[in-house]
Amino acid sequence: MSEILHRSLTRPVRVGNLIIGGSNEVIIQSMTTTKTHDVEATVAEIKRLEEAGCQVVRVACPDERAADALAEIKSRINIPLVVDIHFDYKLALKAIESGVDKIRINPGNIGRREKVEAVVNAAKAKGIPIRIGVNAGSLEKQFLEKYGYPTAQGMVESAMHHVKILEDLGFYNTIISLKASDVNLALEAYTLAAKTFDYPLHVGITESGPLFSGSLKSAAGLGAILSLGIGSTVRVSLSDDPVEEVKVAKEVLKSFGLAANAATLISCPTCGRIEIDLISIAKEVEEYIQNINVNIKVAVLGCAVNGPGEAREADIGIAGARNEGLLFRHGKIIRKVPEATMVEELKKEIDAIAAEKMAEREREEQELANQSN
């Protein structure tokens, strides 16, 4: 997708062990729903998010109790930790000192210049970035009065205002988000922001709703934005278990070929030719590949006549027939299997291919590490 090349023009920003922006992959982020001061509950939820494929996690820091818990949380998780700060610069300083990987603030809301400068200097000293988070629902009064209501222009001007505060202090290690619950507004804001800034953009449709409707709304909004090559990190915001946010985000990225470390399932919608219980098989396989973290495409198809040819791009697949199934790789049949065991045989093939790809990835990573040394 040539439009995706836009992302290579953004300035790379390090967040923990990840490089965000530049020509790097789009990163999946989520946010905990626990009380941050409850370390056990927060770590447990983050571990679940990690397992689902979350790559960066954000926690709220509304008070001293939350700030006091950050170091312990950070020491017990494996992905970069981002902390959400509003208004109180002392909480930001404490979060930075605790070793978090990024903070999310709006400098204009922190207070006097010396307070902002203290936060910026602390972030510089630790080498961590700051995310400026503009939200249509909390746009500053000056921009609401100028435009009459939340607009893309007002949102980008708000971001420019906060960016200037940081740049005037010599700080450029910045990520920007411009979230709205209205898909068209978000699309317009991110499109304008991509033309205005060279900083990485964190994209999302905020307050998108419960699981079903929110997933569709997020997919529509994120899909439109990502199709323009805009976005270095993504979050799906749902009124549900945050693990579901990660699942939806992975599926959106996979749809655009932007998920380097995720398995994809393709399956047919069924018709009168079907001789197997394809729907239940597809659900079982989808669940099985959920936590496979390599780029593998799996097909589950109901028609043995057309199935293999229709899914020739799949790494591995199965096509059902009466009392049997055909296992195929890249459209070529490798063997017939009895219907009773075809799902288990498919899983074995999936595991073998995943192991091959994982080993190949590890070799490539080792070669890169050797070159850098």
Curated annotation (Swiss-Prot):
Its EC number is 1.17.7.3. GO terms for molecular function: 4 iron, 4 sulfur cluster binding; 4-hydroxy-3-methylbut-2-en-1-yl diphosphate synthase activity (ferredoxin); 4-hydroxy-3-methylbut-2-enyl-diphosphate synthase activity (flavodoxin); iron ion binding. Gene3D superfamilies: Dihydropteroate synthase-like, Sulfite Reductase Hemoprotein, domain 1. [4Fe-4S] cluster binds at residues 268, 271, 303, 310. InterPro entries: Dihydropteroate_synth-like_sf, IspG_bac, IspG_bac-typ, NO2/SO3_Rdtase_4Fe4S_sf. The keyword Protein biosynthesis does not apply. Binds 1 [4Fe-4S] cluster. Keywords: 4Fe-4S, Iron, Iron-sulfur, Isoprene biosynthesis, Metal-binding, Oxidoreductase. It catalyses: (2E)-4-hydroxy-3-methylbut-2-enyl diphosphate + oxidized [flavodoxin] + H2O + 2 H(+) = 2-C-methyl-D-erythritol 2,4-cyclic diphosphate + reduced [flavodoxin]. It comes from the Bacteria. The keyword Iron applies. Pathway: Isoprenoid biosynthesis; isopentenyl diphosphate biosynthesis via DXP pathway; isopentenyl diphosphate from 1-deoxy-D-xylulose 5-phosphate: step 5/6. It is an enzyme of class 1 (oxidoreductase). Its cofactor is [4Fe-4S] cluster. One of its GO terms (biological process) is isopentenyl diphosphate biosynthetic process, methylerythritol 4-phosphate pathway. Converts 2C-methyl-D-erythritol 2,4-cyclodiphosphate (ME-2,4cPP) into 1-hydroxy-2-methyl-2-(E)-butenyl 4-diphosphate. Belongs to the IspG family. This is 4-hydroxy-3-methylbut-2-en-1-yl diphosphate synthase (flavodoxin). It comes from Exiguobacterium sp. (strain ATCC BAA-1283 / AT1b).
